[in-house]
Amino acid sequence: MRTPYCVADYLLDRLTDCGADHLFGVPGDYNLQFLDHVIDSPDICWVGCANELNASYAADGYARCKGFAALLTTFGVGELSAMNGIAGSYAEHVPVLHIVGAPGTAAQQRGELLHHTLGDGEFRHFYHMSEPITVAQAVLTEQNACYEIDRVLTTMLRERRPGYLMLPADVAKKAATPPVNALTHKQAHADSACLKAFRDAAENKLAMSKRTALLADFLVLRHGLKHALQKWVKEVPMAHATMLMGKGIFDERQAGFYGTYSGSASTGAVKEAIEGADTVLCVGTRFTDTLTAGFTHQLTPAQTIEVQPHAARVGDVWFTGIPMNQAIETLVELCKQHVHAGLMSSSSGAIPFPQPDGSLTQENFWRTLQTFIRPGDIILADQGTSAFGAIDLRLPADVNFIVQPLWGSIGYTLAAAFGAQTACPNRRVIVLTGDGAAQLTIQELGSMLRDKQHPIILVLNNEGYTVERAIHGAEQRYNDIALWNWTHIPQALSLDPQSECWRVSEAEQLADVLEKVAHHERLSLIEVMLPKADIPPLLGALTKALEACNNA
């Protein structure tokens, strides 16, 4: 045990309890003394980032792979830069703890006009800004620090959302008592009467259903129930699909998997399997505009049984207080009795194998990439042509597929990939990002090179903001960006650039380069030249829906 033991040590021990081995962030004068304890910690490794926005994205990517992450910024200027990323973590249910190093308690009490403040002697402005985008918050004092750290962390673990701790510089050094027990959050259990009522209602519906299908989404992943869903479809063969954020839950090459459900933009086979079912088991779903091609999904309450993290629904009746794992266990048992295999002729397995010739287009790019993906990959696809083109990829077992279509902050994936590779150094990380998106967060390439990471980064260069062009202003210069020499950037961002770069414009070139980088131990950047106006089919349907909504 470290002596003298203080609040900083207590917080670091609790981060370890939550599963974090790293702390992302940017140093600032109000958090430097806390950082001394981080550097001395045997369990937590400091990971400095190029800026706070990137650090928040990196922490998010890390948490999606490890289940929890922590981020450190400095008061005011640092924390505000990170709030975009924290808001995305909140929207998409990712538990990232935001620790903010703040001015000392005495200075705050005196209302001193300090740097990084608004000059009004008030120190809670930014705390209040964080309240809507975190599930629990605390201003730590010498008296409450240990209790509040535990409260915020247990709430985060239960709700799978971010938390916020303001840590004044002096409080970090105050004496604390080491924790006796590891931090755990108690698994909730449903009231027996409520669970029975849900079971009875679900059984009545399933018993009358001739065709039952399963539709899963990202909240299954956030609550650690991926393997439960995989086991479910093995024990009870039935048609199943995911939404975009839930890709990777299933082995997408197995029988019974139909693809990605996206409302009217779904393939005919997926629409028939899901919308044509008498009963659809919707587990961990969120029917957002970008996931449903503008709310074009055709699923009625009467047709669905819905399972959310802390409640379940049959028809129009909600049963609150039922944890997702218990609802799933109940439905698996009922499905074994009442669901019989039907409409099981899928999966097509994969996009047809390409003939690698001709200039690159959206179509032959994704077909070529399909042959490159292998079990265990971590794939991050940025908002836009990357995410919505990847929707038709058929992922093998144990692939992590990371997208951010609800929050939709372009540039997210480059920095999130840094976090993902930090969490999983021995797995292959593949980044799919547009040129416009990459310009927002490219600095984190330097951090990847510093830490000797070796992701495979594909920059889809279509000369600007293609999604925005598809929505509105196809020829307007506000959708243009500066044209960069992408293959030279890694060299500029490291004095020891252990990287290789390529620019490809032909399908055969891409196939050859992918074969070269398949087992590389260095960072690989591939600039993929694509037509300016070429977009994946789903993105075309989505942009039309968004344009109509904006004009309504």
Curated annotation (Swiss-Prot):
Cofactor binding remark: Binds 1 metal ion per subunit. Binds 1 thiamine pyrophosphate per subunit.
Binding site for thiamine diphosphate: E52
UniProt EC number: 4.1.1.74
Keywords of the record: Decarboxylase, Lyase, Magnesium, Metal-binding, Thiamine pyrophosphate
Recorded catalytic activity of this chain's protein: indole-3-pyruvate + H(+) = indole-3-acetaldehyde + CO2
Thiamine pyrophosphate binding: annotated span: 385-466
CC annotations in GO: cytosol
Binding site residues for Mg(2+): D435, N462
Gene Ontology molecular function: any one: pyruvate decarboxylase activity
Cofactor(s) it depends on: a metal cation; thiamine diphosphate
Matches recorded under CDD domains: TPP_PDC_IPDC, TPP_PYR_PDC_IPDC_like
PROSITE patterns: TPP_ENZYMES (PS00187)
GO biological process terms on file: aromatic amino acid family catabolic process to alcohol via Ehrlich pathway; auxin biosynthetic process
Pathway(s) annotated for this protein in UniProt: Plant hormone metabolism; auxin biosynthesis
Subunit structure: Homotetramer.
Family recorded in the similarity comment: Belongs to the TPP enzyme family.
Protein name: Indole-3-pyruvate decarboxylase
Gene (UniProt): ipdC
